[in-house]
């Protein structure tokens, strides 16, 4: 999965997919009442990027729905996965469940079109704080109570705080989450970060009793770092330059071993050689 980083304006969906992304990451900010409000990152952000592009969240969802609904004039067949980077640090811990409920309602209405031929992309809810795990339960409860538990088949999870792998495992246990787990690791492109924790995450993914299904590394803009991440065995790379990742995947060393994921590749299934 080549994951376009910080895609917060509808116009950027086309831009990143046309550069080679089959997945995008979108920032979601919340208001004081835990309503998802804007797709917005703000300052500071990655080096070389404009930090202030934004849409109202529900409007972004409608644009995203068009981009992922077969037959729509804006449809991109290869856009198959969307990571919502949920900026919950503005909320109190006890608002996490409400944030999940309100997020589910927004997605149900504006993205899934109330279950009637909505967008088809898989969705990862990426949460920065382990203490906010009840966002996942609030989300699930709402889809169930609104009569669409089947949409949970399209939903996965990530805790993005670079926490100890063991602590993340415990948190999923508390949340009652088994499966559909992505594990992110990374840092802004302005700084360097080693691959030690990525290797631990990959080892967990490949063990018989691990909780992780997929591992992705962010934010990678350089060819050398891309190669290092691929050598470590990641499933996804988040980037500001999808074309750079696509170029490296075309190199003879990687062409035989990796390919770009399509809609038929289940993002919740651990890949077995």
UniProtKB/Swiss-Prot annotation:
Q: Per its record, how is this protein called by name? A: Dermonecrotic toxin LdSicTox-alphaIB1av
Supply the EC number(s). 4.6.1.-
Listed binding positions for Mg(2+) are 25, 27, 85
Essential cofactor(s): Mg(2+)
Recite the UniProt keywords alphabetically: Cytolysis, Dermonecrotic toxin, Disulfide bond, Glycoprotein, Hemolysis, Lipid degradation, Lipid metabolism, Lyase, Magnesium, Metal-binding, Secreted, Toxin
Q: In which tissues is it expressed?
A: Expressed by the venom gland.
Function of the molecule: Dermonecrotic toxins cleave the phosphodiester linkage between the phosphate and headgroup of certain phospholipids (sphingolipid and lysolipid substrates), forming an alcohol (often choline) and a cyclic phosphate. This toxin acts on sphingomyelin (SM). It may also act on ceramide phosphoethanolamine (CPE), lysophosphatidylcholine (LPC) and lysophosphatidylethanolamine (LPE), but not on lysophosphatidylserine (LPS), and lysophosphatidylglycerol (LPG). It acts by transphosphatidylation, releasing exclusively cyclic phosphate products as second products.
GO cellular component terms given for this protein: extracellular region
Would the keyword Lyase turn up in this protein's UniProt record?
yes
GO MF: lyase activity; metal ion binding; phosphoric diester hydrolase activity; toxin activity
According to its UniProt record, which reaction does this protein catalyse? Answer: an N-(acyl)-sphingosylphosphocholine = an N-(acyl)-sphingosyl-1,3-cyclic phosphate + choline; an N-(acyl)-sphingosylphosphoethanolamine = an N-(acyl)-sphingosyl-1,3-cyclic phosphate + ethanolamine; a 1-acyl-sn-glycero-3-phosphocholine = a 1-acyl-sn-glycero-2,3-cyclic phosphate + choline; a 1-acyl-sn-glycero-3-phosphoethanolamine = a 1-acyl-sn-glycero-2,3-cyclic phosphate + ethanolamine
């Amino acid at each position: 999965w080549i994951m376009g980083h910080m895609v917060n304006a509808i116009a950027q969906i086309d831009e990143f997919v046309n550069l080679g992304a089959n997945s995008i990451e979108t920032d979601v900010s919340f208001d004081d009442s835990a309503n998802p409000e804007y797709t917005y990152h703000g300052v500071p952000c990655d080096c070389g990027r404009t930090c202030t592009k934004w849409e109202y969240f529900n409007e972004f969802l409608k644009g995203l729905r068009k981009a992922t609904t077969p037959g729509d004039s804006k449809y991109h067949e290869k856009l198959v996965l969307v990571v919502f980077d949920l900026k919950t640090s503005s909320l109190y811990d006890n608002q996490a469940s409400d944030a999940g409920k309100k997020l589910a309602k927004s997605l149900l209405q504006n993205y899934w079109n109330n279950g009637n031929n909505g967008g088809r992309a898989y969705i990862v809810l990426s949460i920065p704080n382990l203490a906010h795990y009840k966002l996942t339960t609030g989300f699930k409860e709402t889809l169930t109570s609104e009569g669409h538990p089947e949409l949970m088949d399209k939903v996965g999870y990530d805790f993005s705080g670079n926490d100890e792998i063991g602590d993340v495992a415990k948190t999923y246990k508390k949340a009652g989450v088994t499966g559909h787990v992505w594990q992110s690791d990374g840092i802004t492109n302005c700084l360097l970060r080693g691959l030690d924790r990525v290797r631990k995450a990959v080892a967990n993914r490949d063990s018989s009793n691990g909780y992780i299904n997929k591992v992705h590394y962010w934010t990678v803009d350089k060819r050398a770092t891309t190669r290092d991440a691929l050598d470590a065995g990641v499933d996804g790379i988040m980037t500001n330059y999808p074309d750079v990742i696509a170029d490296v995947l075309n190199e003879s060393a990687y062409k035989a071993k990796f390919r770009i994921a399509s809609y038929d590749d289940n993002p919740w299934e651990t890949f077995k050689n």
